[in-house]
Amino acid sequence: MTTKKQPDSTIALNRKAGFDYFIEDQYEAGLVLEGWEVKSLRAGKINLSDSHVIIKYGEAFLLGAQIQPLPTASTHFIPDPIRTRKLLMNKKELNHLIGSVERQGYTIVPLSLYWKKNKIKIKIALAKGKKEHDKRDTIKDREWQRDRSRIMKKNT
């Protein structure tokens, strides 16, 4: 008996977050979305690169994520591609995030958006910003890994 392969459930990745921040803890959260946004996410029309999470009034909100509406979206209202979206999380997780952001100088960045049991989830991370020299070190390490793999490939 063969099992069905699950298709890749990842909708979008924020590759810029790994370059700009030191990632500490990761959390999973649900998103409050409208119907047209879900349709656009199925089509993959989202950009997470300039987005971040803020905590206001004890709730988490996603800011700056651009979900482009499909051309077939309803004409009865004007969809806002950069609207603020509420994140659904446990109170315990929210309290931990609030403490880290306010006291220790962390920021919260989205890492990826994916499907989980027909629901859209977002992976967010508690992160500290990198300085310019840290980013240069990251670039040097990445280039060294590439060169090392080329050298190993030639020698084999």
From Swiss-Prot:
Q: Which PROSITE patterns match?
A: SSRP (PS01317)
Determine if Cytoplasm is one of this entry's keywords. yes
Q: What is its main location?
A: cytoplasm
User: Which Pfam families has this protein been placed in?
Assistant: SmpB (PF01668)
Q: Which InterPro entries match?
A: SmpB (IPR023620), SsrA-bd_prot (IPR000037), SsrA-bd_prot_CS (IPR020081)
The listed locations are: Cytoplasm
Please indicate if the UniProt record lists Methyltransferase as a keyword.
no
Basic and acidic residues: bias regions = 135-150
Q: Where is this region: Disordered?
A: 135-156
Which GO MF term does the entry hold, naming one? RNA binding
Q: Which residues cross the membrane?
A: none
What keywords are annotated for this sequence in UniProt? Cytoplasm, RNA-binding
Q: Name one GO biological process term.
A: trans-translation
Return the GO cellular component terms, semicolon-separated.
Answer: cytosol
> What family does the entry list?
Belongs to the SmpB family.
- Function of the molecule: Required for rescue of stalled ribosomes mediated by trans-translation. Binds to transfer-messenger RNA (tmRNA), required for stable association of tmRNA with ribosomes. tmRNA and SmpB together mimic tRNA shape, replacing the anticodon stem-loop with SmpB. tmRNA is encoded by the ssrA gene; the 2 termini fold to resemble tRNA(Ala) and it encodes a 'tag peptide', a short internal open reading frame. During trans-translation Ala-aminoacylated tmRNA acts like a tRNA, entering the A-site of stalled ribosomes, displacing the stalled mRNA.
The protein in question is named SsrA-binding protein
